Amino acid sequence: CNQSTLQMLLEIFVWIGYVSSGVNPLVYTLFNKTFRDAFGRYITCNYKATKSVKTVRKCSNKIYFRNPMTENSKFFMKHGMRNGINSTMYQSPVRL
C-alpha cells in the first residue's frame, strides 16, 4: 500500500470513531428502557430513593440505614480485617 492510501484509511477510521461516539447516546436512548427511565427522571428532576437502602429503625429524629457496603465495613472493623483478610491469617512477605 502506498502512503496516500494509508492516510486515507486512517482518516476514514477516525471519522467512523467520531460518528460511533456521536450515535452511541442515541442508541442507548432509543433501545434501553432503563436508560430512558433514568434519563427522563434526571431531566425532570424526579429523583427516587435507591432500592438498596433499607430503613432499619427510627429513634426520635434519627433514621438508621443499612446497606451491604456499610454492613461489610462494620464486620471487617469488628473482626480486625483489611480487604476481607484477617491479619492473623495473613503475614506480608515484606515483613521481617
UniProtKB/Swiss-Prot annotation:
<keyword id="KW-0325">Glycoprotein</keyword>
<keyword id="KW-0770">Synapse</keyword>
<feature type="short sequence motif" description="NPxxY motif; important for ligand-induced conformation changes and signaling">
    <location>
        <begin position="24"/>
        <end position="28"/>
    </location>
</feature>
<keyword id="KW-0564">Palmitate</keyword>
<protein>
    <recommendedName>
        <fullName>5-hydroxytryptamine receptor 2B</fullName>
    </recommendedName>
</protein>
<comment type="function">
    <text>G-protein coupled receptor for 5-hydroxytryptamine (serotonin). Also functions as a receptor for various ergot alkaloid derivatives and psychoactive substances. Ligand binding causes a conformation change that triggers signaling via guanine nucleotide-binding proteins (G proteins) and modulates the activity of downstream effectors.</text>
</comment>
<keyword id="KW-0297">G-protein coupled receptor</keyword>
<keyword id="KW-0807">Transducer</keyword>
<dbReference type="GO" id="GO:0005886">
    <property type="term" value="C:plasma membrane"/>
</dbReference>
<feature type="glycosylation site" description="N-linked (GlcNAc...) asparagine">
    <location>
        <position position="2"/>
    </location>
</feature>
<feature type="lipid moiety-binding region" description="S-palmitoyl cysteine">
    <location>
        <position position="45"/>
    </location>
</feature>
<comment type="subunit">
    <text>Interacts (via C-terminus) with MPDZ.</text>
</comment>
<dbReference type="GO" id="GO:0050795">
    <property type="term" value="P:regulation of behavior"/>
</dbReference>
<keyword id="KW-0472">Membrane</keyword>
<feature type="topological domain" description="Cytoplasmic">
    <location>
        <begin position="31"/>
        <end position="96"/>
    </location>
</feature>
<dbReference type="GO" id="GO:0042310">
    <property type="term" value="P:vasoconstriction"/>
</dbReference>
<keyword id="KW-0812">Transmembrane</keyword>
<feature type="transmembrane region" description="Helical; Name=7">
    <location>
        <begin position="9"/>
        <end position="30"/>
    </location>
</feature>
<keyword id="KW-1003">Cell membrane</keyword>
<comment type="similarity">
    <text>Belongs to the G-protein coupled receptor 1 family.</text>
</comment>
<keyword id="KW-0085">Behavior</keyword>
<keyword id="KW-0675">Receptor</keyword>
<keyword id="KW-0771">Synaptosome</keyword>
<dbReference type="InterPro" id="IPR000482">
    <property type="entry name" value="5HT2B_rcpt"/>
</dbReference>
<dbReference type="GO" id="GO:0007507">
    <property type="term" value="P:heart development"/>
</dbReference>
<dbReference type="GO" id="GO:0006939">
    <property type="term" value="P:smooth muscle contraction"/>
</dbReference>
<dbReference type="GO" id="GO:0043005">
    <property type="term" value="C:neuron projection"/>
</dbReference>
<dbReference type="GO" id="GO:0004993">
    <property type="term" value="F:G protein-coupled serotonin receptor activity"/>
</dbReference>
<keyword id="KW-1133">Transmembrane helix</keyword>
<feature type="topological domain" description="Extracellular">
    <location>
        <begin position="1"/>
        <end position="8"/>
    </location>
</feature>
<dbReference type="GO" id="GO:0045202">
    <property type="term" value="C:synapse"/>
</dbReference>
<keyword id="KW-0449">Lipoprotein</keyword>
